[in-house]
Regions:
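N-terminal Rossmann/SDR dinucleotide-binding element
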Residues: 1-52
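A short helix->loop->beta-strand "cap" motif at the edges of active sites that frequently abuts
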Residues: 2, 91-95, 141
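Conserved catalytic-site loops of classical short-chain dehydrogenases/reductases
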Residues: 5, 53, 94-98, 145
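Residue-level signal for the nucleotide or nucleotide-sugar donor/cofactor binding architecture
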Residues: 9, 37, 76, 154, ...
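Hydrophobic/aromatic anchor residues within beta-strands of the central parallel beta-sheet
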Residues: 31, 73, 96, 144-147
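Conserved residues in the N-terminal Rossmann fold of short-chain dehydrogenase/reductase
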Residues: 32-33, 75, 177
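Conserved Rossmann-fold NAD(P)-dependent oxidoreductase catalytic core, especially the SDR/UDP-sugar
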Residues: 56, 60-119, 124-125, 130, ...
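NAD(P)-dependent short-chain dehydrogenase/reductase
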Residues: 86-89, 110, 116-201
């Protein structure tokens, strides 16, 4: 890409990710402090920048915290997702990719359920966009797609740091079921999956 917009509501995270790119002269980086739940900010971003692709990774993803704070979890994971989709649709952004989770499959907790609803929101906008394209083939219509992750090693939402801490303290390791099986991918594998989702979405 020529320009990469980093929209992040956590000041420290935005500072650190911006610093990772600071020596990259091939891409212009624009750090933007704010939330995808801010309608006025989204409109400003889309008016001032030619946005082609949105990777929507904003979500509360720690299961116990969302379980204890369901209203905030739903606002962030569901309502803000709907607002982003509405604005992306309105501005005819080419592609919007939702970063979802395997916990959205037959969800057993509020976090998983909120991500499943976010997926359904994307599906609704995808169907509406496809209908508009069918009615007017020359119209620029957005493509809504999604990708589901399992556990990503080294990510902020991974269970691995918890396991490491429990092992360092002599155990035991907290498992939800004795027969539980967990699948992991690395950050580079996850990044490649997201890029493939963007490339394959039509």
């Amino acid at each position: 890409p020529k320009v990469l917009l980093l929209l992040e509501n956590n000041e420290a995270n935005l500072y650190f990710i911006n610093n990772e790119f600071i020596n990259n002269k091939n891409i212009e980086i624009k750090p933007i402090l704010g939330s995808c739940g801010n309608k006025l900010l989204l409109e400003k971003i889309f008016k001032e920048n030619k946005v082609d692709i949105i990777f929507h990774a904003a979500a509360y993803k720690h299961v116990p915290l969302v379980q204890e704070n369901p209203i905030e979890g739903i606002i962030n994971n569901v309502l803000n997702t709907r607002l982003l989709c509405e604005e992306a649709y309105k501005f005819s952004i080419k592609k919007i990719i939702l970063i979802s989770t395997d916990k959205a499959v037959r969800p057993t907790n509020i976090m998983g359920a909120s991500k499943r609803v976010a997926e359904q929101i994307f599906q609704c906008f995808s169907e509406e966009s496809a209908l508009q394209k069918k009615e007017n083939p020359k119209k620029d219509c957005s493509i809504f797609s999604m990708v589901r992750f399992g556990n990503v090693l080294g990510s902020s939402g991974s269970v691995v740091p918890l396991f490491q801490k429990q092992i360092d303290q002599g155990g035991p390791i907290t498992l939800t079921h004795p027969d539980i099986v967990r699948f992991f991918m690395t950050i580079p594998e996850a990044a490649e999956l997201v890029i493939q989702a963007a490339a394959m979405s039509e």
